[in-house]
C-alpha cells in the first residue's frame, strides 16, 4: 500500500507507537516502539530477539497505534495500522541512531558504541484507520 502523506507525517513526527503482536496462545503482546519509514514500510529496531520478534516470526499479523496530537470533531486524533511484519537481522544501531534524531533531539545518538547489530521489524501496511486526516 502506498502511504498517504498524512500517514507518513504522523509516522515520522516522533510519536511513540504501540506495536501489538500475537503470543502463541493468541493473546496480545504490546510494546512501545520508535518507528520510522523505509519507503512505504514502517520500521522499528531492537537489540535483542524479544518476545515481540519471536511472535512476528511465528505469526506476521501486527497492529500499530499511536496518538498523533490534534483533534477532529472534538476527538483526539489517533492512527491505527494493521499489517504484516517480517524480521531482518542487523542494522539496529544505525536505525536507532537515525530515530534518536526525531525522538530525542537533533544530533542525539541512542545505540552505544559496539552495540550488537540486532534486528529490524519491517511492517507492510494493509489497512489504515483511526481518527484524523487519514480516516477512510
Report the location of each language-model feature.
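Extreme N-terminal tail/first-helix region
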Residues: 1-16
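A generic local structural motif
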Residues: 3-6, 29-31, 49-51, 108-109
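Amphipathic alpha-helical interface surfaces
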Residues: 7, 49-52, 92-95, 99
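Short beta-strand segments
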Residues: 14-48, 64-67, 78
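A solvent-exposed, acidic/Ser-Thr-rich amphipathic alpha-helical stretch
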Residues: 40-41, 53, 72-75
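Short coil-to-beta transition motif at edge beta-strands of beta-rich domains
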Residues: 59-61
Amino acid at each position: 500500500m502506498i502511504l498517504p502523506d498524512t500517514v507518513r507525517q504522523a509516522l515520522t513526527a516522533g510519536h511513540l507507537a504501540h506495536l501489538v503482536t500475537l503470543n502463541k496462545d493468541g493473546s496480545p503482546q504490546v510494546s512501545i516502539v520508535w518507528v520510522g519509514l523505509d519507503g512505504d514500510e514502517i520500521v522499528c529496531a531492537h537489540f535483542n530477539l524479544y518476545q515481540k520478534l519471536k511472535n512476528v516470526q511465528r505469526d506476521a499479523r501486527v497492529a500499530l497505534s499511536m496518538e498523533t496530537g490534534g483533534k477532529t470533531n472534538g476527538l483526539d486524533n489517533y492512527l491505527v495500522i494493521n499489517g504484516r511484519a517480517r524480521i531482518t537481522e542487523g542494522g539496529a544501531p544505525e536505525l536507532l541512531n537515525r530515530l534518536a534524531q526525531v525522538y530525542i533531539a537533533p544530533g542525539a545518538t541512542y545505540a552505544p558504541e559496539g552495540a550488537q547489530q540486532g534486528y529490524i521489524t519491517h511492517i507492510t501496511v494493509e489497512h489504515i484507520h483511526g481518527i484524523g486526516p487519514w480516516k477512510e
